[in-house]
Amino acid sequence: MKQHIKIGITDCGKFDNYRRWLESEPGVEVVRLSMHFQNAADTESCDGILFSGGEDLQPALYGKPEYVEEFGLQEIIPARDEFEYQVIEKALAGEKPVLGICRGLQLINVFLGGTLVPDIPAV
């Protein structure tokens, strides 16, 4: 049984909460994967990836660019989407387990061909 595990976490405003949660277990090492570091290649050294929460995904990624105006989406960071697409591509190519929380789950869904409704009450 492996005594040490390395988990990559995508960067977000609550990164330290995720880091503390994972590092509360002995033998867990966390790698911060960030568009600011452009370190998607570090995914390859990780045993698994946690895609964190945060801003809305670009609706163009799931074929609905009109949603930006239709739903008044303002918190979109295209550079984060592009970076995390690189991370998920590397993770899946390396058959690494992935976990998405909130935005992270939406990212995985869209990457695998799914779609989203940005504001369920508005539908």
Tell where the protein language model's regions lie, with residue ranges.
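N-terminal beta1-alpha1 cap of cysteine-dependent amidohydrolase-like domains
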Residues: 1-99, 110-117, 121-123
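Conserved G/P- and acidic residue-centered "switch" motifs that form tight phosphate/ATP-binding loops
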Residues: 102
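Cytosolic ligand/metal-binding cores
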Residues: 106
